[in-house]
From Swiss-Prot:
One of its GO terms (cellular component) is extracellular region. Coiled coil: none annotated. It comes from Amolops loloensis. InterPro entries: Frog_antimicrobial_propeptide (IPR004275). The keyword Hydrolase does not apply. This is Amolopin-P2. Mainly adopts a combination conformation of random and beta-sheet. The lineage of its organism: Eukaryota, Metazoa, Chordata, Craniata, Vertebrata. Antimicrobial peptide with activity against Gram-positive bacteria. Has been tested against S.aureus (MIC=37.5 ug/mL), against B.pumilus (MIC=75.0 ug/mL), B.cereus (no activity detected). Does not show activity against Gram-negative bacteria (E.coli, B.dysenteriae, A.calcoaceticus, P.aeruginosa) and fungi (C.albicans). Does not show hemolytic activity against rabbit erythrocytes. Residues 1-22 form the signal peptide. The keyword Transcription regulation does not apply.
């Protein structure tokens, strides 16, 4: 049970970091585009952040 709690805490922490990085990238994109971000860019950033978080979690446990 303790290892499950540690694993969930780690996944939450990695997810929080990924979302933070995604927001920073979005802010940089807004500055480049004059404040305009398309829906496609938002989806791409979110999906890449989720994929990075999953890869980090799998490499940690694998």
């Amino acid at each position: 049970m303790f290892t499950l709690k540690k694993s969930l805490l780690l996944l939450f922490f990695l997810g929080t970091i990924s979302l933070s990085l995604c927001e920073q990238e979005r802010g940089a994109d807004e500055e480049e585009n004059g404040g305009e971000v398309t829906e496609q860019e938002v989806k791409r950033n979110v999906l890449s952040s989720v994929a990075n978080g999953i890869n980090r979690a799998l490499s940690f446990f694998g």
